[in-house]
Amino acid sequence: MRSQPHVLGIVLAGGEGKRLYPLTADRAKPAVPFGGAYRLIDFVLSNLVNAGYLRICVLTQYKSHSLDRHISQTWRLSGFAGEYITPVPAQQRLGPRWYTGSADAILQSLNLVYDEDPEYIVVFGADHVYRMDPEQMVQHHIESGAGVTVAGIRVPRSEAFAFGCIDSDESGRITQFLEKPAHPPGTPDDPNSTFASMGNYVFTTKVLVDAIRADSENSDSDHDMGGDIIPALVAAGEASVYDFKDNVVPGATDRDRGYWRDVGTLDAFYDAHMDLVSVHPIFNLYNRRWPIRGATENLAPAKFVKGGLAQESVVGAGSILSAATVRNSVLSSNVMIEDGATVEGSVLMPGVRIGKGAVVRRAILDKNVVVGDGEIIGVDLERDRERFAVSQGGVVAIGKGVWI
């Protein structure tokens, strides 16, 4: 039986998420609720835990209180055999300054690496929606002999200009790492597709530590993992690509295999929710063999009264629909929709209240938003723009606790 390598997980969760405003006005991006029962960070943590990686440091910074609390309450491990998932705010170990970039966050947290002394380090982002078995990527990294392995997802070449792109040879060695190039490269076996970086990396520990320390002495660096560390290791011939399509997750369907979404904008966040609601969803939340774990609340079941109806929708625990109609929507816990109200193509976070006869269409309502009787949202975008944020795609976004 092959012994498992000693692996430390580092999750980069300090993102500010300006493009998701107003959802990030009062919380870090990885703490934004998603899918009716989760926060964005639950996807990466579920992937790591399902793979058996139970020593994980989550590096936090921006408005991190709700994120730190969620990790501490939801992701408590037994502590048996040194298992832990711990939030690590900026410690200012190297002087009175906060993290200046993702690489600097790791630099300021190298004491955690030295304490754990792992053979390999997985460095994953905290704000993508997907399933992945990181163990398969680690094994690929070991077999490749590279210093760093970058997860790449195949995207149409015509759309790849929006991503950090990977140019690799037939052996998988990365020859160029290009940030949003005007002319993206093809993959070795398909000129019409491009490897886009998923922001997930596996490092041999010494390679990461040496690269982080060298970068810290470069005054011209932005101290960013994707912008500085990876290109430097590509130039040194130390980087390889891991093809995400080769990752086989137990219980995945043909429809959701290979699903990965960057939800960094309001439109992308909205679209990812719409991927959840069909009879055969593009992303299946109900895979019991590779579960996504979230906070467990002691709530009553959802209730539908006086002919309340929900079609092609996700409805969270504790929610009540009273003579209301919900279509193609995701409702989190404790949502109340009153008589005669209509909700279509919308995302409602915990504690939202929709008054009698109100209409909500193509909208994202943050926690504890109250929509008064007869109010109309998402129908007249010109009027909505005077009151709320409206995305390029016409999605109305209303921040936490707003009364309308």
Swiss-Prot record:
Signal peptide stretch:
none
- Name its pathway: Glycan biosynthesis; glycogen biosynthesis
A UniProt-annotated Pfam family: Hexapep_GlmU
Q: What class of enzyme is it?
A: transferase
Keyword field contains RNA-binding: no
Q: Which family does it belong to?
A: Belongs to the bacterial/plant glucose-1-phosphate adenylyltransferase family.
Q: How does it assemble?
A: Homotetramer.
* Main function: Involved in the biosynthesis of ADP-glucose, a building block required for the elongation reactions to produce glycogen. Catalyzes the reaction between ATP and alpha-D-glucose 1-phosphate (G1P) to produce pyrophosphate and ADP-Glc.
- Protein name, as recorded: Glucose-1-phosphate adenylyltransferase
Query: Which organism's genome codes for this protein?
Result: Rhodococcus erythropolis (strain PR4 / NBRC 100887)
Gene name of this polypeptide: glgC
